Amino acid sequence: MASAQSSGSSGGPAVPTVQRGIVKMVLSGCAIIVRGQPRGGPPPERQINLSNIRAGNLARRAAATQPDGKDTPDEPWAFPAREFLRKKLIGKEVCFTIENKTPQGREYGMIYLGKDTNGENIAESLVAEGLASRREGMRANNPEQNRLSECEEQAKASKKGMWSEGNGSHTIRDLKYTIENPRHFVDSHHQKPVNAIIEHVRDGSVVRALLLPDHYLVTVMLSGIKCPTFRRETDGSETPEPFAAEAKFFTESRLLQRDVQIILESCHNQNILGTILHPNGNITELLLKEGFARCVDWSIAVYTRGAEKLRAAERFAKERRLRIWRDYVPPTANLDQKDKQFVAKVMQVLNADAIVVKLNSGDYKTIHLSSIRPPRLEGDNIQDKNKKLRPLYDIPYMFEAREFLRKKLIGKKVSVTVDYIRPASPATETVPAFSERTCATVTIGGINIAEALVSKGLATVIRYRQDDDQRSSHYDELLAAEARAIKNGKGLHSKKEVPIHRVADISGDTQKAKQFLPFLQRAGRSEAVVEYVFSGSRLKLYLPKETCLITFLLAGIECPRGARNLPGLVQEGEPFSEEATLFTKELVLQREVEVEVESMDKAGNFIGWLHMDGANLSVLLVEHALSKVHFTAERSAYYKPLLSAEEAAKQRKEKVWAHYEEQPVEEVMPVLEEKERSASYKPVFVTEITDDLHFYVQDVETGTQLEKLMENMRSDISSHPPVEGAYAPRRGEFCIAKFVDGEWYRARVEKVESPAKVHVFYIDYGNREILPSTRLGALPPAFSTRVLPAQATEYAFAFIQVPQDEDARTDAVDSVVRDIQNTQCLLNVEHLSASCPHVTLQFADSKGDVGLGLVKEGLVMVEVRKEKQFQKVITEYLNAQESAKSARLNLWRYGDFRADDADEFGYSR
C-alpha cells in the first residue's frame, strides 16, 4: 500500500501527499478502511476518516461483558450513508490525502475515487446527497470548505436525505441479532437464495452476514469446508494456524461488504450453514481449489451445489500440494485397473454390508460395501451373553437389510469399483481380529447399493478422521442419503418400535419337527428361502409363512458325502462331493424356492423335493452326474425324469459315473419249495422307528376308533382338567401325558427317576418321552385299554441283520425314517421271535419291499434263514446284497469286511 511507504506528517504539510489504496471496508458514512496490494501475504491496512463532515452513527450491539447494556440503534440516515459509500467504493482504487492526525492515531483527510485528486470527492458527494453534513462551527475559509458549504445548501434546497421532510425514522434498521429457532428459520427459506451483505469475515470459511430485507445479522459457516482458524489463547490473544490469515484475506478481498446471495442449508448450534453465491464465482469451491480449505464430512452432506464439485476442487489442490496441502502424500495405488473395476455375479449376501461375487475367472471374492456399517446391537439391546445370538434375526433391521440386498442382487451382475483395501488387524481386548477386506462401491443399473441401503435407514455411514482418504468414492452421497433417512425417520432412525422376528429354528429338534411335519405335508408346495447349503443335498431353509428354519434333505437321490470332522480324525469327502455342493450353492443359495415335504428322518431333518424356476433340484443333480438315484424314488412322481437323467449321465460316464461299467444280469435259478410262504399283507400306518430298527404301527382298520376315542378323551379332559401335581406316577401304570404339541395322549409309565423325570411310553404311537409329573394325569376309565387296546404294535424287519457299528446303524435308521415314518404301508408277518414279530413291509403305492431296498443300498446285511418257505425271498435278498457289494455301497465301501474274525465285531456271515 502506498501509505505504507509515504504518509503525511501529523502536523500536515502545506501540500498534502497523495496516497493510494483499495477500499476494503466502509465503517460508516464518514470512515473507511483502505489496504495496499498483497505481496507474499495479507497487505497492511489503515482507517481514513473524512475531514470536515459528519454522518450518522450505525447501530451497535451492547457488549457481552455488560449484561445490563442496551443495543444502540442506527441514527437517521446513517445506514443509507454507509450504503452509498459501500456501493461506490468497495474494492475500488482510491487516492487520499491526510490533513490531520490525532494523538490517538486517528487520521482525517480527503478521499477521491480514482488514481488522482481529479476524481470524485467522496465527502462532497455525501453532503450533496444529504447523507452527511458539514461539521458544526466550521468556517468556510478555503475552497474545499466552500464547496462543502455549497453542496449542503443545494441538498437543503432540494430536500435531499437528512434535509427531507420528516425525522428520517424510516432509514433506521430493525436489526435482529438473534434467531429463536434457527432450524425453523432455515427451513422457512426452502433453500432459496437470500439477498445479503457480508459484514465481517471471521476466518476464511466463517462470515457475519446481514440478510435482506429483514436485517437479520447472522453468522454463516460455509457448508462442506473448513479453513484454518485463529486460535484464542488464555491471555485473549489470537494465534493464527498456518495459512489462516491468507485464507481470511482471500475471502475478505472477494466478499467483504459485497452484495451476495446466500442459500441457507442447515444450522449448527446458533450458526447457519450456507453457500454464498457471487456473480464472480462460488467462494467455497475457490477456497478448496486454492488450498485454503479442506472438505469436512459433517457438513458436506447439506451442500446443495454438488458435493462432488467440492471433492474435485480439494483433489485439485492436493495433487498440486497447494498451501495447506504442501506436505500431502497421496495413498499408494496397489491395484491394477482390471482389479479395481470389474463386473461380477452376486452369489451370496453376508449380513448387510458384504457380498460374495463370482468373477469372470470363476473365482469367488468377498466384497464389503465401502464406508457403511450394518445394523448392530447397542446399549439396552445387548443380549445375555449366555444366549446364543442370531445376528440376522436378533439385531434390529439386520433381516430387513439382508433381504433388501438379497432381493436386489442375488444372481444379478453388478459393477464393482474397489475404493480401498482395509488391511488385516489383530484382535484386542474389545475388538475381534479382522482379515484383509476389499471395500468397494457396488452398482446395479446405475444405482449405488450402499446409498440405497443407507437411504432406507438399513445401514449407517462410517465417520472417518478428516485426513483419512480410505473411504467410499461416493462418500458424500452416502452422507446425504443418511441425512435424508434421519430426516424422514427411516429404518434405524425411526421412532417406532423396532421390528421383531421370532424365527423358530427347529433344525435337529426332533420333537418340534414332528409337530411341524403334518402341517408341511398338508401344505403341498411351500415357499422357502435357501439360507445355507451344507452339501449337495442338505440345505437349511427359511419358511416365511411358518417363520421357521428347517434342515432339508433332497429326496430320491444319493449325493456324495462331504468331508467330516470327527473326534481325533478328519473323514475325507467322497469324490465329487465338493462339486455337488458348489453346484447346489450356485443354483439355489439365497434364492426363493418351493419345497414339498414328504417325511422326516430320526434327527428331525425334513425330506422332500425342492423346485426352483420349475426345475427339480434332485433331477438336476442326477442330470449333471453329481448324484445317483436312490431306490426310494421309485414311488415318487419324479422317478421317470430321475431315471432318464441318470441313464444319460451313465452313458456320458461323467463324474460319479466316470468308472461305470454295466453289470451282467445274473440269472437266479428258482428254488423249488416244499412249502409255500404265506403272504397276507394288511394296511398299517407307521408311527415310530426305534434306534435298533424296530418300528411301531397302527392298524388302519381301527384308525377311526382311535381318532374318536382321542377326540372324546380330550373333550372330557378339557371339561375336567387334571389338577397339576396331584397325580403320583407308578411304574407300569397307564396314565395320560401332555405331549409337546400341548395335547393329551394315553401313555404307560416305564420308570420314575424323580418327580421331574418320569419315563413314559405313548401306547397308541410307540414313542417315548421323559416328562415332569406335572404333565401327567390319571387315565379316565372311559378311555382305558379295556375300551380300546393300545394301538401301537412293535415289529422288526425280517431277513435282515442290523449293523452293530453305530454310524452304519444310524444311516440305516435314517433311511427307514425318511421312507416310511408317518406313511401307510403293507405288512406281512413272516415269523415270530421272543421280542416281537418279524415282518416284511411294502410301500403302499409301489409294493416295493422296504427291507430289500435297504439291502440294495448296502445299509444292512441279509439274515440267512434255513426254512424252506423263505428260500425264494432269501435268494432275492442275497442277490441284492451281492449287487451292493459289487458297487461298494455304504457297508461294502471297503469291500467284504466280514473276515474270519468278524464275529468279535458283532457280524456273522
UniProtKB/Swiss-Prot annotation:
Give every TNase-like domain span.
17-165, 192-327, 340-495, 524-659
Show the InterPro entries listed in the entry: Silence_cplx_Nase-comp_TudorSN (IPR016685), SNase_OB-fold_sf (IPR035437), Staphylococal_nuclease_OB-fold (IPR016071), Thermonucl_AS (IPR002071), Tudor (IPR002999), Tudor_TDRD11 (IPR047386)
As stated in the Swiss-Prot or TrEMBL entry, residues carrying the post-translational modification Phosphoserine are 425, 644, 784, 908
Superkingdom, natural source: Eukaryota
Q: Which residues carry this modification: N6-acetyllysine?
A: 192, 640
| Gene Ontology terms, MF aspect | endonuclease activity; endonuclease activity, active with either ribo- or deoxyribonucleic acids and producing 3'-phosphomonoesters; nuclease activity; RISC complex binding; RNA binding; RNA endonuclease activity; transcription coactivator activity
**What is the designated name of this protein?**
Staphylococcal nuclease domain-containing protein 1
* Source organism (scientific name): Rattus norvegicus (Rat)
**Lineage, top ranks:** Eukaryota, Metazoa, Chordata, Craniata, Vertebrata
